[in-house]
Each structure stands twice: as C-alpha cells, then as structure tokens.
C-alpha cells in the first residue's frame, strides 16, 4: 500500500494489533525491555510483524513504543540503534504484502510541567530524537499513540512536524468516563490535534470496542472532514488473570458498529493477536467507510475545558495592565501571584475565556507573556486569549499553550496579516481581526466591514476557516464619538450575517469618561448581544454585566432550562436602595459570600504563593496542628472528593497538592523554630516494580500522601524485590505501595509481594496501575487495590490514621 492510499477512504485501512502481549507469549522474559526485541530476538519480532501483515494489516507499527532516551537509559544501546533495528524488522515483514511501516511512539513516562517536572521543550527534544531516527531508518509515517496528556501530545506533534515530512497519526487513551487519565476531553483532543496538523486522529487502548464507540462518535463529529479517524481498542475488558474477555469473533462483531460512524481505519491494541486482525479484515473488507460529517463549530479549549462559542461568551478582561497599577507592578516585578488570583476570581465570577496581555513599556513582552501563560495554565482551566500584536511574543506563547487559544489580534495591515496569520495556522489558534488599518478606525460601518472582509479573505488564504475568525468592529467612547456606537453595532451585525464569522467587542470602552459607567456598559452589552455579539471582553466581577449575560442566555434559549441562571441566582436576594447619584442601585446579597478560611481557599484553588502567605498568617494566631487539621487536610479532602466525582481533574489535584506543600513548609519552619518534634502519621514505602519504567502514577501518589502528613520513601522505578524488602525492614513501614503499568511487569509485582511475605514483615501491600483490577490484585497476593492517588490516601488514613 502506498501511504497516500491511507487517506482516500475508498476502503477500510487495517492497522495491526497488540505487540507487548505477543512478545510475552513468544518468549519475552519478565524485566526484559520490549523495545530491545529487535536486537535480542529479531526473528521473533519479524515473525510477529509477518503474522500481522499476512492477517491483512496495511500498517505495521514498529516495536518502538518506548524507544526514547529516558526509557532506554542504561540498556547499552542508543535510540538510533534501537529504532533502526526495529524499523528494519517491520520493513522485512512488510516486503511480501506491501504494508506501510509506522514509527510507533508512546508517552515518555513523565508528567509535563505544571502537573509534573518535565519541561515542554525537554519533552519536545526527546520526541524529536526518536522521530529523526525513525525518518532516517525509512519509516512511512509517525504514529503517536496511547497518549493521556494533551500537552505531551502537542510536544510530540510539533517534534514530528518540525523534524520530518512524514504523515502524523495521533491517538489518545480514554477512561470509561470519557476523559483521559489527566482529564482531557475527546473534543479538546480532536480540535487541538487537528489544529496542530495531525493527518489522522484516533483512540486506542484502555477499553474495548463497545466502550470506546461513543467516544469515537464524538471524535468523528469534532475533527475536520478531511482528517481520517481510526480506532485500536483492546480485546474487550481485562479478566482477573490479565487476559481479555473477547475472542476474535466477538471483537469483530463489536467493531462492526464503527463502519457506520465515519471511522475509516481499524485495528487492535492490548490482548489482540493476528487472529483478531484477520477476523477484522474479513468483516470490514466488503464494507466502505461511511461519510464522516463533522460539526463545524467555533471553539476554544484547554485539555479539561471545551468552550463552544455558540452564543454569548464572556472573556475576562482583568489580566491587562492598562489602567491597573497593581497588575502593572506585578508584571514589572515578575510576580505571578497577582495575575493568578485575578484569573481564579474571574473564573469563579463566570468568565469562560481569559484575556492575557503583557504589553508594557520597559519589559520583555515575549518573555513575560510566555511566563504568564505557563503560570495561568497552572491555576485555571479556562482557555486563554493571547492579547498581543507582537509576533515573537505570540510565537512563544502559542508554542507552550496547552489546547486551542485565540489570538487578539491582527488588523487590516498587510504586514500584520503576513506575520501573525501563519502563526495562528501553525498552532491551531483562532484569531481576532480588528476593523482598522493604517488609516485608523473608519467612522462608518461600511468602512469597518470592508476591512473585515480583507481580514477574512487573508485568513482563509492562510488556511484558517471562518469558524476560527472573530471580527472586532471596535467600541468607541460615547463621550467622544456618540454616533460611533450605532456604527459599531451595524458593522458587527453585517460581519456576522454576510461574512459568516464570529464577533468580539471590548464592551467597557463605551463608557470611558462618563459617570455611572455600569449603566452604559450594561445597556451597550445588551444591544451588542442583540446584534449578534459572540465574545464579550468585559469585567466578569461586575454583577450587573454578568446578570445581563445570564438573563440574555435564558431569553434566547442558550441556557436550556435556565440551569446556569438558577445556579447563579437561586439564593440571591435583591435589595433596592436610594443613592444620591441615581434612582436606585441593585446589590446582590449572598451571591458570593467569601469563605472565612484563606488557607483552605488558597489550597483548594491551587494558589501556591497565597497558600504560603495564608499559612504564615494563620500560624500567628493558631497552633501548627490546628492549621493542618482545620485548614489543610479539609482542603485536600475537598479537592480529592471533587476528583472522585469527576469535577476536579489531575492537574488541579496536583496544583492543590503543590499549594498545600508550600503551606506545609511554613508549618515545618514554625515547628522547628519552637523546638518541638515534627510528627509523622506513619511511614510508607512506594516503588515501581522491576522492569517497569513508568512512574507517573506512583509519583502522584507520593505527592498526595506526603501532603497528608505521611513519611514516604520513594524507591523510584525498575526496583528489585530485594530493595523493597530491605527498605521496609529498615524503616519499619506498615504500608507498601507497588505500581506497574505493563502486563509484562505484573509478574515482578507478584514476586515483590511474595518476597515481602517470605520476609515475614508486618506490613500491608497496596497496588495500582493501568493493567490491574481488584480481582487481579487479589490473585497476585496484594492486600489492597487502589485505582488512583485519592484511593491510596483514603487507605492510608484507614490503616495508619
């Protein structure tokens, strides 16, 4: 098959099946690195590829899933050696059938900043090394799979796009709730990957065909028509013994439903064999892929928050130094705490997007905007509007933004369009176009519309579709140009109606220089919404403005069943009082009663600097133990409960833990200064078992347990059973946590548990990892199965107090 045939949709394209379980079944020993099979057992590896090719696979994934520098450390071989040998084995198998060979790339095994410690550009470099090696070895395409972190996937896509000219396939793994391990939604994945230039997108691993089907349907609706969608499910769900519950016939029968939803490529993942692919080939070969009918929608996103701009959407304006002395000083000082608190406050007030501006004389705008984006991504899940016309600043901010942002802005000047539109296209961003050019802002609606038309034409020519274009017809001050308001709204309405684009306005400019600005702002906002305004850049902390937005959504059926309106105002009482300046003002009582515990709130919101300051303040009035028990632990419990319910996601959980850690440092310092002994709730030993180099989950468990006051000894990854036994013996730990991600390393987990039992140590063992289930944990001798960090903390509290 020629690689171009993959995209013509004339027939179904067949991907191969599981590799790790096949290697294990054909002689791979526990602890042996699967990625070295091409060097240590090449005949076996080639035979597996050959079996898949003979079963009908059009694309063979080379055995390079973990062939990166981090995972190959200490193995005695370079990335280039492993990748080249692996590609050669797949290529040899493909000779007889003409199958394509894919450079298979999985996650690096570490969380990226801010959730972890791996820098974005460091992840990029790791992926780039593998991709250059794969391209040099003759791979036909790059296959990025089993990703759970959208930020890591972005680094990998950019590495592929910038280091080779091969097609790029991307795939993420979703849990049963419809989100990845880090909380990413299907829609956020789809628009981000497609926007970055993925040639095909898909879903693999974690679940079986029946469970993945609804997520694949959402994926087909969310990617552009020209981007193929593929699926590689597991062979059903895992059994207690580590096998899977579907045979080839059952698997193919469940997979057949995908033929009707727009998927055009099918294969298998864990537990599937050449027999599964052969049965898939028999089932799908007579069929033709159904047309994929995506929904063309305007949207912005972060991994966990997908904002569809289908009606009035609020953009918080407060992270802009213009007229804001405190923010101005914070930016000059490099102080991220204040803008972060502004972000959190605006989100809680109802903003759906946050404008971020670092344009300030005397500072490095590019460096400042980049750092602002990094800091804000750590504390808020709202999409960002990158407010700059500086190409360097935008390039740096767009590169490290996690999701799909909007750029504010370009204008009718050719130079601006030529420099900024390509950046928006490369990074998959939406763009705001200001209806002005070198002649300034036209006084008439016709003049502004003409500029808007030029901007839309230029954006389309750059490959940016209308749904990603937002026109700002510009709000002029009523005090100076009173007739301008009508011209602005007329131009806005024409752009929406005739150009088929979205619209945006900075609402509060209308009232500058006039008294009682809130009246003018609210009235103009209502007029603009009626004219078709989509993005309102405004202060969401103004109750009257937000009330107008929420009421408008109810009356135009954007807020179905008035859900948001009722949630905001069910407990609000209205007080009308006379003032000397106006007939009446409206005060909202009880709408946002502030919590009395600043430390609790800072930890809950994940604000590190505020948590430290609040802890310092609390310690002047309260005993350290009281601060821990009354403020810190309840805050962590609240965030953990949200995580359990699916309202809080992994990044927020880790940010709360980081904030709590900052507070704990203050508490430890206070205890040390008083000469008191620091207490511990108990000692826990944790490790990733021998042969397994994946330690993301284990690291998260460590952070959470430490913040609950436990003394945690982390032995790291690829840990021998003997080291675990010795650590428990030396520390007297009463609880041991073992982690394994791969089916091939679960036997080593069992061996470690058996070694602990043989040593007659007085400890309990909890286990966790993607391949484990409660039944499987019991079968290998574990005392407890913990599905996540919150479950581990709950168990520790139960056992150790």
Residue ranges: model-predicted function:
Residues 1-801:
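Domain-level signal for soluble alpha/beta catalytic cores
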């Amino acid at each position: 098959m020629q690689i171009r045939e993959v995209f013509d949709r004339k027939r179904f394209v067949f991907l191969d099946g599981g590799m790790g379980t096949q290697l294990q079944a054909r002689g791979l020993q526990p602890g042996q690195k699967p990625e070295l099979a091409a060097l240590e057992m090449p005949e076996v590896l080639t035979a597996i590829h050959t079996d898949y090719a003979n079963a009908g696979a059009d694309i063979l994934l080379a055995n390079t899933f973990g062939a990166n520098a981090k995972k190959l450390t200490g193995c005695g071989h370079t990335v280039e050696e492993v990748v080249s040998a692996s590609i050669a084995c797949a290529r040899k198998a493909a000779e007889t059938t003409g199958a394509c060979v894919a450079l298979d790339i999985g996650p690096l095994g570490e969380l990226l900043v801010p959730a972890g410690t791996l820098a974005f550009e460091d992840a990029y470099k790791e992926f780039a090394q593998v991709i250059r090696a794969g391209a040099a070895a003759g791979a036909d395409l790059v296959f990025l799979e089993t990703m759970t972190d959208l930020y890591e996937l972005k680094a990998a896509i950019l590495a592929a796009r910038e280091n080779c000219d091969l097609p790029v396939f991307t795939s993420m793994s979703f849990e049963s709730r419809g989100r990845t391990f880090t909380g990413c939604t299907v829609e956020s994945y789809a628009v981000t990957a497609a926007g970055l230039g993925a040639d095909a997108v898909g879903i693999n691993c974690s679940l079986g065909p029946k469970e993945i089907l609804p997520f694949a349907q959402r994926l087909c609706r969310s990617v552009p028509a020209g981007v193929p969608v593929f699926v590689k499910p597991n062979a059903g769900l895992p059994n207690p013994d580590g096998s899977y519950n579907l045979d080839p016939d059952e698997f193919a029968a469940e997979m057949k439903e995908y033929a009707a939803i727009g998927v055009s490529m099918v294969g298998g993942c864990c537990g599937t064999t050449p027999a599964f692919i052969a049965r898939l080939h028999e089932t799908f070969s007579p069929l033709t892929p159904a047309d994929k009918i995506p929904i063309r929608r305007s949207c912005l996103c972060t991994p966990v928050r997908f904002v569809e701009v289908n009606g009035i959407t609020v953009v918080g304006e407060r992270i802009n130094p213009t007229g804001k002395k405190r923010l101005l000083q914070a930016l000059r000082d490099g102080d991220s705490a204040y803008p972060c608190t502004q972000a959190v406050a605006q989100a809680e007030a109802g903003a759906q997007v946050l404008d971020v501006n670092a344009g300030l004389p005397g500072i490095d705008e590019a460096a400042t905007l980049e750092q602002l984006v990094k800091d804000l991504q750590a504390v808020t899940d709202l999409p960002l509007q990158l407010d700059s016309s500086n190409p360097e600043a935008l390039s740096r901010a767009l590169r490290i933004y996690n999701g799909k942002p909007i750029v504010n802005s370009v204008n009718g000047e050719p130079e601006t369009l030529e420099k900024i539109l390509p950046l928006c296209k490369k990074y998959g961003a939406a763009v705001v176009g200001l209806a002005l050019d070198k002649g300034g802002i036209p006084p008439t609606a016709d003049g502004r519309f003409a500029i808007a038309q030029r901007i839309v034409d230029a954006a389309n020519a750059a490959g940016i579709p209308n749904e990603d274009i937002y026109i700002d017809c510009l709000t002029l001050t009523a005090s100076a140009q009173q007739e301008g308001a009508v011209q602005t709204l007329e131009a806005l309405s024409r752009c929406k109606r005739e150009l088929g684009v979205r619209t945006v306005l900075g609402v509060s400019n209308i009232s500058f220089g006039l008294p009682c600005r809130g009246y003018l702002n609210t009235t103009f906002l209502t007029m603009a919404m009626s004219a078709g305004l989509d993005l309102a850049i405004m202060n969401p902390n103004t109750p009257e403005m937000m009330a107008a937005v929420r009421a408008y959504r109810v009356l135009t059926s954007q807020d179905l069943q008035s859900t948001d309106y009722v949630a905001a105002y069910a407990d609000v009482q209205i007080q009308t009082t006379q003032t000397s300046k106006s007939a009446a003002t409206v005060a909202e009582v009880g709408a946002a009663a502030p919590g009395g515990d600043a430390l609790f709130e800072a930890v809950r919101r994940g604000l590190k600097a505020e948590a430290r300051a609040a802890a310092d303040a609390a310690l002047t009035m309260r005993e350290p133990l009281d601060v821990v028990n009354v403020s810190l632990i309840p805050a962590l419990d609240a965030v953990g409960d949200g995580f359990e319910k699916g309202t809080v996601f992994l990044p927020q959980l880790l940010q709360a833990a980081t904030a709590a850690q900052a507070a704990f440092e203050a508490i430890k310092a206070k205890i040390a200064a008083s000469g008191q002994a620091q207490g511990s709730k108990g000692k826990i030993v944790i490790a990733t078992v021998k042969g397994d180099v994946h330690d993301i989950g284990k690291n998260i468990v460590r952070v959470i347990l430490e913040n609950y006051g436990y003394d945690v000894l982390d032995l790291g990854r690829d840990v021998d059973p003997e080291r675990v036994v010795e650590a428990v013996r030396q520390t007297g730990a009463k609880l041991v946590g073992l982690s394994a991600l791969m089916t091939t390393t679960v036997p080593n987990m069992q061996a470690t548990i058996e070694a602990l039992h043989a040593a007659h140590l007085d400890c309990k063992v909890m286990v966790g990892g993607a391949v484990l289930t409660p039944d499987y944990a019991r079968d290998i001798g574990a005392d407890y199965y913990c599905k996540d960090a919150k479950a581990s903390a709950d168990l520790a509290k139960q056992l150790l107090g």
